[in-house]
Amino acid sequence: MVEAFKGTTTVGIVCDGGVVLASESRATMGSFIASRTAKKIYQIDDLVGLTTAGVVGDAQALVRMIQAEARLYRMQRGEPLTIKAITSLLSNILSARRYFPFLVQLVVGGVDKMGPKIFSLDALGGQIEEHDIVSTGSGSPIAYGVLESLYKPGLSIQDGSVLCVRAVHTAMKRDSASGNGIALVRITKDRYEEVPTSEVEEIVRSL
């Protein structure tokens, strides 16, 4: 069997008025670094993002499915799917494939009429609403140590951005499957923002 691209650290946190998502950009095949620029955060709808950990091909297939479903729902109903609905749909897709599973961990985060929300999903479709912090992937045990130590409810979007970068940056130091650049996304009720690399690098230098 051909070995698949995999490996990751992703994090997500709920902030005051929004959600912050972050990941690194390394994909591995065993001990080989297959890519230094792997995309792991995807925009699903106007104010919803999804992070992926696990097998890259499986994750990309799921992203295409859920993006199409979100667009179709908006066209038919004239309004967006809620974050809970997007998560439930993904859960159903994953559960239906439980005997031949998508080898992924997902985080869905964003802002809808209910406010900022983050959910995590496992490969068999189990879903959990995370009310503060979440991390997935091989570097998650390290990232969780940073998040648990420094997260406080009501954190601002800017401070949340720094915390997410710190968590991923720390994981990259110890997890060989995580590395290279850091991607950062901020979502508020007004916008989905992919933070420029220059700003992320400035945050890293300030740590």
Curated annotation (Swiss-Prot):
EC numbers on record: 3.4.25.1
Keyword vocabulary terms for this entry: Autocatalytic cleavage, Cytoplasm, Hydrolase, Protease, Proteasome, Threonine protease, Zymogen
SUPFAM superfamilies registered for this protein in UniProt: N-terminal nucleophile aminohydrolases (Ntn hydrolases)
Propeptide stretches in the record: 1-7
GO BP: proteasomal protein catabolic process
Active-site residues, record numbering mapped to chain: T8
Entry-linked PROSITE patterns: PROTEASOME_BETA_1, PROTEASOME_BETA_2
EC top class, as a word: hydrolase
Gene3D superfamilies xrefs: Glutamine Phosphoribosylpyrophosphate, subunit 1, domain 1 (3.60.20.10)
Superkingdom field: Archaea
Entries under InterPro entries matching the protein: Ntn_hydrolases_N, Pept_T1A_Psome_bsu_arc, Pept_T1A_subB, Proteasome_bsu_CS, Proteasome_sua/b, Proteasome_suB-type
Catalysed reaction equations from the record: Cleavage of peptide bonds with very broad specificity
Protein family membership: Belongs to the peptidase T1B family.
Role summary: Component of the proteasome core, a large protease complex with broad specificity involved in protein degradation.
HAMAP family linked to this entry: Proteasome_B_A
Subunit-level organization: The 20S proteasome core is composed of 14 alpha and 14 beta subunits that assemble into four stacked heptameric rings, resulting in a barrel-shaped structure. The two inner rings, each composed of seven catalytic beta subunits, are sandwiched by two outer rings, each composed of seven alpha subunits. The catalytic chamber with the active sites is on the inside of the barrel. Has a gated structure, the ends of the cylinder being occluded by the N-termini of the alpha-subunits. Is capped at one or both ends by the proteasome regulatory ATPase, PAN.
Protein name: Proteasome subunit beta
Annotated organism of origin: Methanothrix thermoacetophila (strain DSM 6194 / JCM 14653 / NBRC 101360 / PT)
Lineage: Archaea, Methanobacteriati, Methanobacteriota, Stenosarchaea group, Methanomicrobia
